[in-house]
Amino acid sequence: MGAFLDKPKMEKHNAQGQGNGLRYGLSSMQGWRVEMEDAHTAVIGLPSGLESWSFFAVYDGHAGSQVAKYCCEHLLDHITNNQDFKGSAGAPSVENVKNGIRTGFLEIDEHMRVMSEKKHGADRSGSTAVGVLISPQHTYFINCGDSRGLLCRNRKVHFFTQDHKPSNPLEKERIQNAGGSVMIQRVNGSLAVSRALGDFDYKCVHGKGPTEQLVSPEPEVHDIERSEEDDQFIILACDGIWDVMGNEELCDFVRSRLEVTDDLEKVCNEVVDTCLYKGSRDNMSVILICFPNAPKVSPEAVKKEAELDKYLECRVEEIIKKQGEGVPDLVHVMRTLASENIPSLPPGGELASKRNVIEAVYNRLNPYKNDDTDSTSTDDMW
């Protein structure tokens, strides 16, 4: 859903921080979409005796940004302040936390519905949500919709959330039981996710509870015991990222970037840029959370990266010189490079992850190019 721009908006919003033995960075980009509907939350050290806990989440809005923005500001409070989460005196148990997360989602969804109807009529926007609540002993993965989170442990994808799509058999059964249908893999032929916050037009079937509606606000929650030796990093991202990169691809790419820089904002920016150049047409947001045992910068990897960049610079110069009269356009350069067996390209990112390096050399050698010929579109690029 949503209209597209003539050129992508590539300006990024960044943030980073550290605490509780964690480091995080994030990046978000509007991309080709007419509006930016993503939002995010990053909190290290929670109030009310949970100073050693942290919370991170990505919200992918649709049909507007209102629900995503409200959730990024208030969902955490709804989770930690309800009685199911607090339980009895002392630190909440695993079951307290899981029940509290579920209750928090249902409460904020109902609160937004009532608030929307009172203020200005029903808000038709909605949002997916993917997040992690990290305690000293556990990582709680939270998912509602088709954004995704994964845990990289011991250099492999150890866990990833499951997308809530209407075509999923259990989701489809609930939709049909509520009187709906799944057409072209969408709820009633329209909405591409089967669980979300907001989307109140899909939550008005009389006689059905909130988790039995066409679209459910109920999250899936998984608790994973932390492993100090093996846990490396967590990635949370909206579907604008996952549309063009698989779980293993993104895990490998991030790991390779962490071996050449400890700047987590830079790593996230590279993820977003690479996904844009791989053809993503959606808003893009990614949060990278690193545990103490995350990959460290390797002098050997840094050297190989510099050698690769130098090689690409030389090849771009050669391609342009070989053309003779008339400078080839950037698409021609990219296609030529894509046809070659270039060693040491970043795993998962491949040539797309080096587009900025290639373009910088191209622009330096061709400073008087016509901007109209230098499209950022990736359609049929290579």
From Swiss-Prot:
Catalytic reaction(s) noted: O-phospho-L-seryl-[protein] + H2O = L-seryl-[protein] + phosphate; O-phospho-L-threonyl-[protein] + H2O = L-threonyl-[protein] + phosphate
Query: What does the record note about the cofactor?
Result: Binds 2 magnesium or manganese ions per subunit.
Which residues hold Mn(2+) 1? 60-61
Q: What class of enzyme is it?
A: hydrolase
- Membrane topology per the record? Lipid-anchor
Q: Function of this protein? A: Enzyme with a broad specificity. Negatively regulates TGF-beta signaling through dephosphorylating SMAD2 and SMAD3, resulting in their dissociation from SMAD4, nuclear export of the SMADs and termination of the TGF-beta-mediated signaling. Dephosphorylates PRKAA1 and PRKAA2. Plays an important role in the termination of TNF-alpha-mediated NF-kappa-B activation through dephosphorylating and inactivating IKBKB/IKKB.
Recorded protein name is Protein phosphatase 1A
Q: Write down the species.
A: Homo sapiens (Human)
At the highest ranks, the source species' classification is: Eukaryota, Metazoa, Chordata, Craniata, Vertebrata
